Amino acid sequence: MENRPRQQTSGHDCSLGTGDDLSSRPGRVDLLRAHISPTTVKQVSVNHERKVVGSSSSRSAVWGISPDGSNAFESKNFGLEGDSNHTVEHEVIKEEDSQKKSPFSCGSAPRVVDSPGASVVSREGRVGPPSDGSAVVSGDDETDANNSEDGTEDEIVSEEGRRTEDEGDVTSRSDQVPCTPPPMWVPEVLSDESEETPLRRVGEERHVSDSSSGGDGYLRGTRQGRVRPHAVPPLFHTPSHFTPVRATSSRLISLSSDSERMHRMAQKVQTQPEMKPKELDKEAERKQEQLRSSKGDNKGIFKGLLRQLTRGYTGVAHLFDGLASDFKPHTENEGSSSNDVLTEERTVQPSSAVVSDKRVTGNGTGVERFKPRVRHRLSQECRPSFPEKPDEETSLSTTLPTKLKSLFSFASSHWNHASPGEGEATEAAGASVSGSSSFLAANANHSPSMLDAYGRPPQKRTQRRSFFGSVAAAASNAFAEAGAVAAAAAEAVAAVGQSSSDSSGDSSSESDHSGRERSRAFRGKRGGSNEITTMRSQRSAGHLSFSREPERESDQGEMTPTGETSGSESELDQVILTEHATPFNFVLWATREAAASLQRPLLSGPPEEEAGNAEELRSTENAIHRRELQRLGRLRAVALRLLLLICEDDSWCQDGTTRQSAHKGANDGARRRFPPIVQGVRGRRRSDRDTESPPTEATQDSEEVDRLWSQWINGSPETEGGEDADRKQEEKRLQGRGVSRSRYMWKAANRMLSVDRRLRKLHSDTAVRRMGETEFWKLYFYQVFLLMNRFDRQAHKVLRSLSCSFTLTTGEGGDENQPQEVAHDVLSQTSGFTESDTSSPSPSYGFASSPCTSARLIIPPTGLPDNTEEGEPLSFGGVSLEPKDEEAPEQVRQDGLGALAYAIFSSSRSPSLSSSSSGTTSVSARGTGSSFSRDVGESPLLVPRDSHRSGVGSETYSAGGDSPALREKVISENAGCLPLGRAPSQPTNTVSSVSSNRAYLEPASRRGSFSVVPVSGRRLRDALFAKRVSSSSQVNGRVSTSRGTMGEDRHQDQQGDNRLEGPSHLSAHNSLYQLGSRSGNCVQIKVKELKELDGTCGDTHQPGLACKGKEVQGARA
């Protein structure tokens, strides 16, 4: 039998089923030769591959062991010796497998041996079609491969039925398994292995052996499970086999005759998995789901190698894909389904396969994943959320880059530290982050103690789940939502700035209400939990897999519209509560609610009730606190969303050094020490600033803060430039390597967290009161400044663009979208509330102007220029802003805070902000190119053209993550905002733009330009007023085409040398917006763009405010 099968098989190998004894030897020799030298004979290699595939698939494929490489090599080595035995065994196994997927009695082998041709045919039929027919070739090579691999693979396979089936010949290796026992254990092994392997292992094996053994593993896997989930090709597979050739010829040979057998085998194999232990089955299924969700879609396109190469992006892409396909807790696993993510997940949890269920079922990912109820609480409370936080942390490990994971993990560690008392505040913050209104409603409906006691109605969970589904459906909307959130965050920031002064009593009552919470929050716990909650929210927004959190939060908000926060809240809640509610809907609601809340007197302080019943006062305080938390939560959510969006590209956030430094110094310090705002800001700022350098002493930080503050106020970035200049150079050096970018992205993430913490403290207003608002805002803006600097110079072009883009959002850009418009109003209110001399008109004006001029530096001055001079173009340009800051640093802080928050958060989603409502954000991206394009434009990634190509609107950003196009797009969107503020300043600071190109922190040069721009400033002012008129149109116009046009024209006219303004800038804008009028004077371009854009939000800044062509013209006038 041995000889006959060998002869037949080898003959079959050579003749593809002829059964030549003579050809068996030559075929084998050829096969060996083919293995040894793949280029030998395609036919022979095909035959050999078929053989190898057959044996390998029958043995290793079943066991999920990829015998590909070993099979090939060993068949080379042993092909001649054990060929017939293994071939017979293989044939028998194949035959039996095809006949029965269960183990076979020894007789099976003889059967197959007796009819080697048939067995080969069946092997071909079974193997050929799925495994490219490689195994169809006679069993000789397969036997060879089996022999060589038999000892290892069969033993590993626990001598599946094949070995046992294998006559004594195979028994030499499969001696361990007697002929009779195989039927008993083989079925179980087959069932376990078949189900697990076919689903997961088999898929991998099959994929591996398919690529490595030319379908051998595939054949085997096909027989067993027919399931070919993104199998991972063995590392060693390809060298010895021609998978394509094998697959093609073998498949052709074996498809016709053996397809039926193969189908039967697959069916039988599918039947066997039932026998598999449920544990293994579940684990395999989980793994399969993970792999399928993450890799399954790409199994055909992305092989294991591609997956590995694109693992970071694939994880994110799969997160979205999985969410889109079906939003499940497994989405996290899906996100982590990529091997690396799975490994990380495994690291987090004992078994990656179980991870998904653990997350889903709350088996506990490193931290107990309590029940969904706990999860629900988590979103609502700090305590519960800390347990959930680990769960989410695990999810992050699966879906997020290592750095983000570490970021979340350190945040989660603080969550873990959060105490129940803190939990209330944390919960409030977390709820406010996503569903602040829900938190308000919860607080209104339930006492904080109830909340602390996890009194959240479980029904909200159900709504949340439905919201999960809606979020999955709204994956694309999540990014637009981020834009809306940015607007809401701007409003929240404005409210915070407003409440910082107004809510001192507010905070006091709030502090009274949650004195313990506040004290703990000051320690950073509440802030940490909020921050984490926000991070989760952002994560969910940025990574749809986490949409669950924002969904939960939004659902809470939707479900609990009863909060005092706003009447519109209930309306929006009704909208959001709908099954189809999307994060974007929630963002819109939150924005609206935030705007309504801002208008409410509670922000000013508790109502008269405060004077009345202590209970009422407490209730009022709680309401105030909730509203503040809502705003801050939204702001944090935007910041975190921005962070996640930036970090969606894993490289941005994956810097172990940065991660550690940020985690050890800034985060804990910010949370633990009361000046956490100061120390945390400084420490984080420090660590963020210099990843390598540990957080410096608070004194040094204070000095630096003071210095930077004075620089901000004075508008001289020299010192700052000096400090960051070295860093900038270093970053530039590293940026090419991608180190600085990831490092700075991580820093930015930490800084965002720090800002969140600061905002929380500001929210409680305790820190502000203790520090004094000036000090507080100094620190806050210093941090923001560092963040902006980091991004303007070193890090993300998107962030740079975001820095400017907030001006658009802050300015009239908000008007375009209702949320934005509300934000604009809020900003104006904030300016007024904030002690800004100029109230709404100036603040918008100033906001738009300063960010464009210098997103970083001008942020604090943003409010000042309004105060400084609405009528003086120069001040508008941003010079006045900084001087105004000097004059009224507190006011500047107020406006600056709103503007800064706008800049940071709205910039984070500036495109989304505009696109959320107008969807014309992508044009805005162009504006960023102008304002930040100084640097960004310089950088090829940020070239406006690319931004245009990358796509318009936040969708590109959401899609692109870190892709240059996306960054460019975001930048362009942001630029859309900048050009207005910047366009006015650009004509003035044509040179200043250039200097900005040299250093983003050159408000002074911009100021100089501003001095040059008196007319432009006036134009901008005119445009601002016009813009405000056309803010609504501005959303579309917000695209910053106007910015590009106006800025371009000004740049070209005054700053022809400016890269933005240069022909490339012009052409970039044209290519990006393809607005014919871009090339020439700004007026034409701007007007046309504005018309095209229906109001250039990019001009939102000032010209941007004049989204209308008339506005632009007025600005130009």
Swiss-Prot record:
InterPro entries: BSD_dom, BSD_dom_sf
Region (Disordered): 1-27, 47-243, 258-301, 325-398, 415-442, 490-572, 600-619, 654-736, 829-848, 858-891, 909-964, 1031-1066, 1095-1117
PROSITE patterns, per database record: BSD
Keywords: Cytoplasmic vesicle, Membrane
Cellular-component GO terms for this entry: cytoplasmic vesicle; rhoptry membrane
Residue span(s) of domain BSD: 752-788
Subcellular location: Cytoplasmic vesicle, Secretory vesicle, Rhoptry membrane
Extent of Polar residues compositional bias: 1-12, 530-540, 557-569, 829-838, 1031-1044
Composition bias, Low complexity: 418-442, 490-508, 839-848, 909-931
Major localization class: membrane
Signal sequence residues: none
Disruption phenotype annotation: No defect in tachyzoite growth, intracellular replication and host cell invasion.
Biased composition (Basic and acidic residues): 83-100, 197-209, 275-300, 510-520, 546-555, 724-734, 1046-1062, 1108-1117
Topology of the protein relative to the lipid bilayer: Peripheral membrane protein
Complexes and interactors: Interacts with RASP2.
Descriptive protein name: Rhoptry apical surface protein 3
Organism encoding this protein: Toxoplasma gondii (strain ATCC 50853 / GT1)
Gene label: RASP3
